[in-house]
Amino acid sequence: MQEFGFMCKEREMETVRGVLPYWPRIYCKISLDLDRRVREATQQAFEQLILKVKKYLAPHLKSLMGFWLIAQCDTYSPAASSARVAFEAAFPAHKQPEALAFCKEEIMNVLLDHLLKETPDTLSDTQAVPIEDRESKYFRVVTCSLLALKRLLCMLPRSENSSLQERLAHLLSQSKFWKYSKHSTSSIRSAFFELMSALCQCSPDVLRAEASRLCPAVLLSIDDSDAVVCPALWEAVLYTITTIEDCWEHVNAQKGVLPKLWSVLREGGRGLATVIFPNLLPFISRVPTNIIKTPTDFYSNFFNSLGQGLSSERAVASPAECSAIISAYMECLRFAMQENAGEEEENKKVQQILISDQLMPLIDSSLKDPKLQNSPLFSQVEETLYSWEKKAESQGLDDKLSRIHATLLREFWENLAHICVSHVDVIEAGEKNLAGVSGLLQVLQNPNCLLKVNKKKKAKIRFKGEGDDESDAVSHVSESQPMSKFIMETCSSSGRDPGIAQLRQERLEDLVCKLAELSMVYISEQRSQQHLMFLAALLSTFPSIRVFQVLLQQSSEEDPKNLNSPDHDVTPRHKNPAVQFLYAKLIFWFNDKSLEESDFLVDILYSVLFCCTDSSERKHLLDDMTKMNFKWSVFLYIIQKACTDPEKYSLASDWLKGEVLGERLICLANDLCTSGLMDKATPSEAYCSKKWALLSLVLSEHVHNEYLIADAYVEKIINKLHSALMKARNLSKAGHLEQSVSFICDVGSNFFSSIKGCLQMPSAEDLLLTIFQLCAQASDTSHMSESLLLKLKNTWLAGLHSLVCQYKNMPQGSNFLKQSAQWVKDQIQTSHLNVKSLQSLICTVDDLYSTILDSSLSGFSLLAEHTASMMPSAETWQKMRHALSSQWLSKPLLEGRLSMNTETSGTDLKSFPKTWLPSHLCTASLLSKMALRLLEKEKSLKEEEIGVKINITVAEMLYSLQWCEELEKPPTLIGECCEMLCSLGVSHEKVMDLSVHLPGLLELLYNRSKEDGSLWSLTANRFIHKRGAGPSELLPLTEDTEKYFPVTLGSLHTIQSLSAFLCPELKEELVIQCTARLMTCSASAVSCTDGGFGYLAIINSCLGSDSDLCQEILPGVLKVMLSWKDDQEDIFLFSSNVQDSSQSLIGLNVEMIRFLSILLKYLASSVSSLVDVDWDFIMCSMLAWLESACESSAAYHIPLVRLFACASCDLATEISHYFESVATSTTMSLPANLMSEWKEFFSEGIYSLMLPMLVRIAEEYKASETSHMSHVLKSLGRTLGYISKEQLLNHKLPAKFVAGQKTNLTDSLQSLLNTLAPLLLYRERSVQITVYHLLDKIMADLPGFDDEDLKSYGDEDEEPALSPPAALMSVLAIQEDLVESILKEIPVGEFAVIEPLKEEFCFVLGYLLTWKLILTFFKAASSQLRALYSQYLRKTKSLNKLLYNLFKLMPHNPVLPGQASDMPSKEPKTFFTEELQLAVKGTATVQQEVPHLACCVYHMTLKDLPAMVRLWWNGCEKRIFNVVDRFTTKYVSSVLSSQEISSVQLSTQVFDGMTVKARSTTREVIATYSVDDICIELIIQLPQNYPLGSITVESGRRVGVAVQQWRNWMLQLNTYLTHQNGSIMEGLALWKNNVDKRFEGVEDCMICFSVIHGSNYSLPKKACRTCKKKFHSECLYKWFTSSNKSTCPLCRETFF
């Protein structure tokens, strides 16, 4: 259908027209389809068809219209809606009736067929559709047909209805039709009743003819409680009793209709009260008198049933249901009263019943039930009462009717008084009951009070004879008639007759006086708080002098002394009874401590004030009360009520502005602040909170933008709060201040947020500054909780927002910015700040800037000035920089980025505080954060001065960050600070983002670098690198090379830092100038900065970054050095203790060594060579410098000595690399004997010095003490990486043996292992990597020493095992414990993050390196040895531990980082596909080193020990089993499979009589074995999860082999491949050997049915003396232990 609709939309009209002849038949069928989605799609497609064919549909309308109308009444709303949309698309609204009239006969035919003829079986295919679906479709079609008939009747023009009379009469005459009223399906019943309502409206005559069927069908269904049916049913009921005049004659009302109605009413409408009960009034209004018979009985039953319905479960639970019942009850009661407003006896009985038995009991019940009190009952009672009052006082009605209603009113008021008194005149009067009484009286007094609560407009019932309230209002009232202001307001707002209101007022006052007097008795005698609250409610509603007189009289009767109390002088102005009552009673109640909450007493107070006519009198009363010692909550309630009610505010406004209240509030503020800060034993929190709430109220509430109290008192209170916060700042512990500070925050926040212009007060600005200061202090400094600091932040931000936004600008006279800037400046420069303190300070100031920039138009200039005022002077910046620790210098010095020839010993010994941050870091980071914030707001800096200051700030920040970065092992404090600053946006990246708007920053950094060098040069280098500045951008600064001479440290460091970014021409010019100056340098200036040292350092720097300059420069410089060797040999530190030399000489020698290293790099990449003299100088100097470095090891704590040692090792490394990489053709151009001299003397000399030096340093220094040795160890390691295996085996290390250590190695080799292996435990990465590379050179040779030992493992050994090198295994045992302690809390399968270069990192790294060596050793062993080694690993369970640990160290996604993401088709590189390069100095990828190494070890383990891994995997628990399988299959199996297949393809191993081929696509290896006439083909299939899964062996071709033998051989190969730790080729070789032995006549072992044992590869040798059969020793051992017998497995005789 959807495709058809789309086709109709897209195709041409002529094409679509072709469908029309077939469409009616298709539509009529599928519009009734079972699937609602099909029906909806059909209507949507029909719409598209209509839009396309338009008028051409007309010929087909009659065949479509019946089903179309049914579709418009579909029970599935989207389908019905789509059908109606299609209908509207076909016909405009005014044409639709005509279209229906045109097709009415056809429509009626379809509808009548569906209603009278069709059945479930005729509508659907009985063979294809289940019975449930058939019935569902039938019920839906009947429902839709009934609704379609209703729609037809309603839409047809009235003139056309007559033409359907006959068809409708026929329908109504059918019994089947009337059965639909009792149908079990609710939708059919609902549709039936809707049709009945439509027939009553459109064709009443037809229905009258069938009244005998209609009336019982409708009226006797009145108790149907189905929610679907009920609305349609009651509509049909009302239409029926209205349309059919004699309807009651066709039903038995007394036995049928009314009992059912009573039942529905008693059950509260059965959950449908909102539907049923609004229909009750029109229903009973149509019940004739002959049905009612006895009105008293009828109305008693009716209202009793309604009353019971109020108690039903649904009515109690649902306010809406309850409201519907109440409304119906009162409407029907008014109707019944109107119908029986006569003086006959029967009428009087009904009136009596309605008043006494119905209305008054209902009111009485409501006073006990809060649900009824919240219902519309009281308002309905009031409306009923008003209608009676109007009739009683109306001049237009006859006297009899007025007299009757007057009697009704009198009876009502008498009964009401009796009910109210019965509820009040009780000792234990219920609080809910009294609230109900007061609520009812309040509604009767002021009907408008409910309108405020419920503003929803409701329809009102107006009975016949009742006029509109507004039209009946009497406009002329006698002026002499006394009338209260309250009555006038009530009448004017409701439009009611004031005369009637006055009459009710009198009756109400009588009742209120009676109840008040009664309450007073209980208050006085019983001290009843409930009665007191009731009295307060009465007086609040009825603030009348008369009521107070009654109360006063009652008080005087009880205790005449109350009126003449000596405490209060009742002067003539207190003749007012209300005032007398205040002093006689109310004051004592306020002082009564048993009355915890006194808010209701405040209502009485306002009633007293209402009765006072003079404002001065009211002020005097309140002032008098203020001087009394009342609870502060009393004044809180007084002011709260004044703020919520304008009338009450007018009564208390003079008092609020007065001095009496103001002074009391100042005293309150002082007491609260003093007690809260000084006394830990503060009053209860609730009591204090009331006091603080009072302060907050008077400071925050305002009327017409004025404070509630006088401005002077507001400022004094703010002063008190400010003083309190200042004290809180100065107290050492603030834990007990939380409550007071929190309250002050609440008060301040309300004050700042609510009053416009509040910060014009100086005290308010001081308060704001103090809160700002508290917020800027970290919680560990201020000792305040995070929640309180958050509240402080919100408070001061509210104040700042008020300061900015309400003025649209910062006020000119504001001191807040100046004071805050000075305070922040003092904090960052003089205070000791930790990370948290600095973060709090930065965040708080940042909040200040953000708020002002977002709110103020001129915020930028204000904050620029603010930032400038916080900036230190140039001298202060200089002092702060000098205060930074010089530890930073060691790292760039040793890495060769800076050169020094002066004292640098302090770089390692000078320490700095570990608990607070340097002031330079704090100042620079805060100021730069603010500067960057300003740049974000306004990119272009119009004022040059602002730009200069921002550049200085950012430059200092970059300097500080560079200092942090250059620290080799910074304290934790510095690392945390850098992370914090990065999270706040104080970083290089942020500066780079905004560097375009800082054009002067590069020049500033360059100038600082040239002036001071050192760290400024590194800062400039980092900035240029991050910014990506090219040579062209630097050219304006660097083009004049003359300004670098004479060379200073500043110019030297600048060149060294910028050399990588300078253009080649500039570097060439610098090198030429320095070379020329070097050649003419005097002897005295050789070691000076502006001499040999400086020139050589510049040359090294430029040549190191540009090799194109080397060819011409290097020979010349080398000649200069040779001349120095001849003329000034003492400047060369050869074979001496460097510690005794000057710093300048050490620096010079370092630069000479670096130059020679550059020379060697150049020689290795070019065809040039040197002459004998040059090589002699280089080689001899290198060895002499190395000897000096070794002799000076005790002075390595001095940076320049350490640098000298590193440079010497690096030179040795470059020489070793050169000779290793020299090509054969190049060797011929080298001087004669140079290579032999290198191999026989120089290289031997290097490593005879280096290897012992490494061991000595490692033994003398613990890892924690070698922080200054790190670079030396790295350089040593790089040098030792070039040692050959022969030189390593011929080492000169002292002998080292371990007692009891079993070994087959030579003494020299064992000593080497015992010396180097423990260094894998060393807590320095470079040592571990160096030792690994050294041991890896010899690992493959070690298994050869165990080959001889194989003979000692005879057949008598039950489970032979052989340990890998004992030195490695002892180290591994220690490492296992260490790693276990690190990883024990991490479950297998979870990735453990190991922090680089920490202690744990070294433990894990050493553990993995040790295993890598063991696996290398294992791979190099023969098959027989591997079996013994694997047996040892199985016994010690070391391999199991390794595998568990690997699955904690390998990442979940081992993808190599840094790959391009724009190549999705290419397989990503992983840690398994890429080799790990373990470089000694490599720190770029150290973050990934442990995960990558773990993956490498796992890869090696799977490759070399597949059987053992498979065994471990099968023994794992289910979760780990799945984790291992999933990970291995996804990342490792494909790599190993391809490697295994490749190894088979590339194998050079040749088998006699067997050929092996491999297929990589199918992961198969095919082996073909041929001997004599026998031909065997075996297909080896690798599993998807290789090597975890079992390798399958399938049979190919076989010729000349018995089936049983064939099966045995396949089983043997499968066993070898599954259980042997080796490759497929090794397994095939073992299998072939086994088959060969079989053909040679060697018998199979009768236990494993194999000639060669699968583990130790032995032949069957143990023979039974009885049956002579031979067995493998290991097989026999397993047989004996598993069977617990010592008999032969075959003959069962005792085995000897």
UniProtKB/Swiss-Prot annotation:
Subcellular location as annotated: Cytoplasm, Cytosol
Biological role: E3 ubiquitin-protein ligase component of the ribosome quality control complex (RQC), a ribosome-associated complex that mediates ubiquitination and extraction of incompletely synthesized nascent chains for proteasomal degradation. Within the RQC complex, LTN1 is recruited to stalled 60S ribosomal subunits by NEMF and mediates ubiquitination of stalled nascent chains. Ubiquitination leads to VCP/p97 recruitment for extraction and degradation of the incomplete translation product.
Protein name as annotated: E3 ubiquitin-protein ligase listerin
Zinc finger RING-type: from-to: 1645-1692
Gene3D superfamilies, per the entry: Zinc/RING finger domain, C3HC4 (zinc finger)
Reaction catalyzed: S-ubiquitinyl-[E2 ubiquitin-conjugating enzyme]-L-cysteine + [acceptor protein]-L-lysine = [E2 ubiquitin-conjugating enzyme]-L-cysteine + N(6)-ubiquitinyl-[acceptor protein]-L-lysine
GO BP: any one term: protein ubiquitination
Pathway this chain belongs to: Protein modification; protein ubiquitination
Molecular functions per Gene Ontology: ubiquitin protein ligase activity; zinc ion binding
Gene Ontology annotations for the cellular component aspect, listed alphabetically: cytosol; RQC complex
Entry superkingdom: Eukaryota
Family annotation (PROSITE patterns): ZF_RING_2
Enzyme superclass (EC): transferase
InterPro entries associated with the record: ARM-type_fold, LTN1/Rkr1, LTN1_E3_ligase_6th, LTN1_HEAT_5th, Ltn1_N, LTN1_UBC, RING-CH-C4HC3_LTN1, Znf_RING
Taxonomic lineage from the root: Eukaryota, Metazoa, Chordata, Craniata, Vertebrata
Renumbered ranges of HEAT repeats: 17-55, 102-140, 144-181, 209-250, 252-289, 354-394, 431-468, 542-580, 596-634, 921-958, 992-1029, 1108-1148, 1150-1188, 1245-1282, 1307-1344, 1371-1405, 1406-1442
Entry annotated with the keyword Repeat: yes
Annotated keywords: Cytoplasm, Metal-binding, Repeat, Transferase, Ubl conjugation pathway, Zinc, Zinc-finger
Family in the record: Belongs to the LTN1 family.
EC number from the UniProt entry: 2.3.2.27
Source organism of this protein record: Xenopus tropicalis (Western clawed frog)
UniProt subunit comment: Component of the ribosome quality control complex (RQC), composed of at least the E3 ubiquitin ligase LTN1 and NEMF associated with the 60S ribosomal subunit. The complex probably also contains TCF25 as well as VCP/p97 and its ubiquitin-binding cofactors.
